[in-house]
A protein has these predicted regions:
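Recognition helix of helix-turn-helix/homeodomain-like DNA-binding domains
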Residues: 38-53
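Short, charged recognition helix plus adjacent turn
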Residues: 1-22, 27, 31, 35, ...
Length: 90
């Protein structure tokens, strides 16, 4: 997953992290994802908009909160040693 562009109802274009958006959609809200990760909602907003990087610990928490529908390797592909992509050849 990557960064995607979204146009809101006012016609404003903004970028969002597709993996974090999928996680929010999966659990129901930014607040619910924040609760699952033990952080405050503004942190989830910052992850969504690329203002803060999701820690390895929270990437795993997101994977667990979404019952694996948003795996940690999609959230932090740069940590392939920690979160290997099972669909990628070694």
């Amino acid at each position: 997953m990557a960064i995607i562009l979204i146009v809101n109802s006012a016609g404003v274009i903004f970028m969002v992290n597709e993996a974090i958006k999928a996680a929010i959609d999966s659990v129901g809200s930014q607040q619910k994802l924040a609760n699952a990760c033990g952080v405050k909602q503004p942190s989830v907003w910052a992850w969504l908009h690329g203002k803060k990087r999701v820690s390895a610990e929270n990437a795993k928490r997101i994977e667990m909160a979404t019952n694996g529908s948003v795996p940690a390797y999609l959230i932090r592909p740069d940590l392939s040693a920690l979160f290997p992509n099972p669909n990628k050849a070694a």
